[in-house]
A protein has these predicted regions:
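Contiguous beta-strand/loop segments that form the cofactor/metal-binding neighborhood of enzyme cores
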Residues: 1-124
Length: 124
C-alpha cells in the first residue's frame, strides 16, 4: 500500500459493554482512515461473548481475497468463497508463550552480572 498519513480520520465509540467501569477508554470503537486509493477500518470491541471468528481476542485483516486472523494462539487465513486465489490456511499454534526464553535470558544476565545482556527493558 505504501501509504503515508491518512487524509481524514473519523471515529465513533463509547462505553457500551461495561458503562459503569472506572475507565476512560471506550470499550467499543470503530475508526475509518481514508488514504489515497483505499480506506482502512479499525474495529475494537469488548464484552462480545466469544468475539469475532470464534476467538475471544485477536486482530483480523480483511482483504479482497481472504481474511488473516492473528492472536496469541496462532494465525489462520480464511479464504473468500469467490476468490480465485488459493491461499494457505494453517492454524499455527505456538508450543510456548516465550516465557522460557525470557527466563533463560534473564538468568544469563544475572549470572554474568551484566544488565546489558537482557533482551528487553526491565520495567518497575
Amino acid at each position: 500500500m505504501q501509504a503515508s498519513l491518512p487524509k481524514t480520520i473519523v471515529g465513533l465509540g463509547g462505553k457500551f459493554a461495561y458503562p459503569n467501569l472506572a475507565e476512560e477508554t471506550p470499550d467499543t470503537l470503530t475508526t475509518l482512515y481514508e488514504f489515497d486509493g483505499f480506506n482502512l477500518v479499525w474495529d475494537s470491541a469488548m464484552g462480545i461473548d466469544n468475539g469475532s471468528y470464534e476467538r475471544d481476542h485477536g486482530i483480523a485483516f480483511i482483504g479482497n481475497n481472504a481474511t488473516l486472523i492473528l492472536n496469541r494462539g496462532g494465525w489462520e487465513v480464511i479464504e473468500e468463497r469467490r476468490s480465485k486465489n488459493k491461499v494457505a490456511k494453517p492454524l499455527v499454534k505456538p508450543t510456548d508463550r516465550g516465557l522460557d526464553k525470557h527466563s533463560q535470558n534473564f538468568i544469563s544476565a544475572i549470572r554474568a552480572n551484566d544488565p546489558s545482556f537482557v533482551n528487553c527493558s526491565i520495567q518497575e
